[in-house]
Amino acid sequence: MVNLIESDSIWKRNFNYLFFSRIVKISGDMFAFNSILWFLIYDGKGAIGTALLIAVTFLPEAVLAPVTGPFMKQTTLKFWMYFSDLTRAAIVLIIPLCHFAGFSPLWFVMTLMIVHSATGAAYNPASIALIPQIVNEQGIQKANAVLQSSAQIVRLGAVTLCGAFLTFISPSYTMLIALVLYLVSGFLVLFIKYTAVESQSESAVVTQRGTYIGRLKRGFRLVRKHQILYPLAIYCIFMNFAAAPWEALSAVYVAEDLNGQPIVYSLLKATTAAGAFLLGFVLAKVKVNRYGLLFVTAGIIEGFAFFITGMNTFLPLVFFAAFTFGAAVSAVNVPEYTIIQTSVDSEDQPQVYAVIHMISNISIPAGAVICGYAANAFGSGKVIAVGGIVEIIAGIGILLFTKLAKAERSDLIKEREASVHL
């Protein structure tokens, strides 16, 4: 299943700029989201308020990603990323300024977070599709793993540092740090220079893909008919539905069930990031042949981590489960991105990623709203544990009844060649 990756360096000019832009942007995201999260908690909104925040954070991005995908050409990917960074910078400036002026009702903050989320519909598909343009095919998995592991180290520092700021100063002042980070990230993206990579089989067909509507439909058709991506998308739905209770209720779980302070929540997130970094580092050193098997296995392990976390309040065991959950995150994201980049031609990658992202992430806001009310009735821990059970059962089903876990790298390449003419 795995072999050591050859030592060809991916650290060249374009990847360096992408690398630093991504880690700075992730830092900005951490500061922005956690500041608003604890603002709602301090304001007495509790589980329902945080659940609504999760809903408006994920839903616009998920819905709009397929809509913006057909506009993305290989030559304009970095400009979509730049636009996203500038828009998010504006959002994190408006919220604290209005709060200082005495105007910060919940509906206003939620509206701005909808816009904040919508920009992800451009940034994420563009950044995923950009990697094969600046890294050779043999280095794609390594590039994904390096970005994933480094992102977790940044989260480790950013979440902990943000927790410290939130403990001593207000969330509004903490958000101003995110403003600077978003501006720096957007500035770095502009230095990326590349020539669009287009295969011979692709160039002969790409002009026949039609208008905007045709490209929009093509993205959904590719996912539906793809023997690897279709079960991947289905399992993503269950994975995100299972993750919704943790995403929506983890802060409330720490505050109410564990009687912890914001710094405990931040340390728990930091432990998760450490687990993700460790496995991301390993995946940067070994070459995986069966990405689907790694993806499904990681999902099942993630489900067990949710179950363990929700069923007990013994803090050391909760931290161990958080570390395991973090490791599973890398083991899910790296193969998911690599499967898309390997089994779909470059012109279709932004749209295919956007479609899978939409299909899977629709379950997050729905699950977040449901679990917010369920937590009031049954408790946050039990709801988190139920999410883990859902993910375990779904993973076993995907493992037994689909081709996802059986596919090797050669199968992904065959699917890519077939998809060009679809």
Curated annotation (Swiss-Prot):
Keyword set, alphabetical order: Cell membrane, Membrane, Transmembrane, Transmembrane helix, Transport
Gene Ontology CC: one annotated term: plasma membrane
Gene3D superfamilies reported for this sequence: MFS general substrate transporter like domains
Membrane topology summary: Multi-pass membrane protein
Bilayer-crossing regions: 23-43, 47-67, 90-110, 112-132, 151-171, 172-192, 228-248, 263-283, 291-308, 318-340, 352-372, 381-401
Location in or out of the cell: Cell membrane
GO molecular function: efflux transmembrane transporter activity
Pfam families assigned to the protein according to its UniProt record, in alphabetical order: MFS_1 (PF07690)
Keyword Zinc applies: no
GO biological process, one term: response to antibiotic
Family of the protein in this entry: Belongs to the major facilitator superfamily.
Matching PANTHER family: ENTEROBACTIN EXPORTER ENTS, INTEGRAL MEMBRANE EFFLUX PROTEIN-RELATED
Protein name per its UniProtKB record: Uncharacterized MFS-type transporter YvqJ
Species the sequence originates in: Bacillus subtilis (strain 168)
Origin organism lineage: Bacteria, Bacillati, Bacillota, Bacilli, Bacillales
